Amino acid sequence: LLPVAENLIDKFGKKLKDLEEFGKDKIIREFSVEYMMKVIKSDLKSLSIEMDNFFSEQTMINSNAIETALSTLKDKGLIYNGIIEAPKGKTHTDWEAREQMLFKSTKFDDDIDRPIKKSDGSWTYFAPDLAYHADKLKRGFDVVIDILGADHSGYVSRLKAVINAFAEKRVEFEVKLVQLVKLIKNEKVLKMSKRAGDYILVQDLLEEVSSDFIRFVMLSRNNDVPLDFDIDLMLSKSKDNPVFYVQYAYARINSIIRTLKISLNDQISINAKTFQPNEYEDKIIRKIFEWPKIIDSASYKLEPHKIPFYLFELSTLFHSYWSKGNEDKK
């Protein structure tokens, strides 16, 4: 937050002191959000990640999108004022019965009906999420994919209820839960803490490892599996470094192309009757023919990790073939 504060002072100087508390808070909040969004967009650009749209929760609140979405649900009889049951495993003294505005999510197989507005009149965290998904459907999406942290798994059922309430099962909805990434250096996990303010920033990581390495490694595990990102390993030139291993295979293949003075676009004729691939060639050819299926499966099942897996397997076969060639010059 120190860079935010420093830039805030540079822009406004002592003017902030003369403002009333409400006006001061508004300026600080808006400036901080704008500054951090610039940082986020810059980091994404450094990783060659393009976002078509950034959606502001505040604009949704200002445009009364929550009220509009709730009006639609009220017309369907899915909003009411009531008291939710006490949470399981808690004593009566830990819970106070208060009437709240509730969304009848149990109608769509959720565990309990979800609060939309608190007894003090303020919105719950769920209210903007409800309106946001309603807005997505208004924009004409027939497939909606949410990416959530694994610690938000309890949110899945209520979000499915929202989609079904608005779209009436006319829209395909899927939630991908993403596990945490552990950064490792010198065989030690780099610990991060919100309270202590200890973070490893994307730019810090980019100073150590290239964006290509980061992108490849981040895609090399299924989203629901925790990922250990070993910085030292990513800088090594060994088979244990999957990025280097794939790049090395690519470099070797290009060296063959240069030696033979051919182009990838050249037509190569093979006589199926006389061509007899050896064991290594047969495995490589079979693996290459898997590529279209890998692409289809990765896109259809939303599992991009299958592509790095495939590239590593293909590279392994090629390196084995290369080593065999060094042993047998024929």
Language-model features and meaning:
Residues L1-K330:
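Non-catalytic interaction-recognition regions
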